[in-house]
Amino acid sequence: MIDLAMCMTLQNEGFGTYGKTLFFGTSPVLDTGSVTNAEGIWVNANTVGINGDLYTDQLTISSRYFDVIEQGRLMLRLLRFVNNRLHEYCRLTCNPIADIDFVSIRVHPATAIDMDAIDGEGRWVKSIRFNVDYKLSPETVE
């Protein structure tokens, strides 16, 4: 659920609107390998490590836009946000969608913007990947 919390953080930072241009738990690349025809930002997480009460997830922020210049600027803004501002957060929350908080956040830097897929018209799905260490709020697990 840290992907939802990241999605809410991106909404609060002005990157889009949840459910319209910001999505979590789905992918712009379909199981057939084809690409969705929607524009927007997708956030997904995979747990890569657990050490006691400390979790490490890899977050993927993907985008697909018809305008490649708009997409390029967006990805640069996202990269700058992840590497220069996200580390200032000590808590990420899923509110108001779900009452789940992630505390003691530590963000590892993102190092690249990757191309994940190309649609039938040559438009790209691009992604930024980075790791986040966190603990669950005690209220979340009760």
Roles of regions detected by a PLM:
Residues 84-131:
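Acidic-leaning, charged glycine-interspersed low-complexity segments
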Residues 65-94:
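Extracellular/virion structural assembly segments
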Residues 1-52, 85-103, 141-142:
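Small/polar-rich, solvent-exposed N-terminal microdomains that initiate assembly or binding
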Residues 17-70, 108-121, 127, 136-138:
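Short, solvent-exposed beta-alpha or beta-beta edge segments that form flexible loop/patches at the rim
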Residues 1-8, 66-77, 131-142:
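Short N-terminal helix-initiation segments at or just after the protein's N-terminus
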Residues 59-61, 77-81, 142:
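Generic alpha-helical propensity signal that fires on short helical segments
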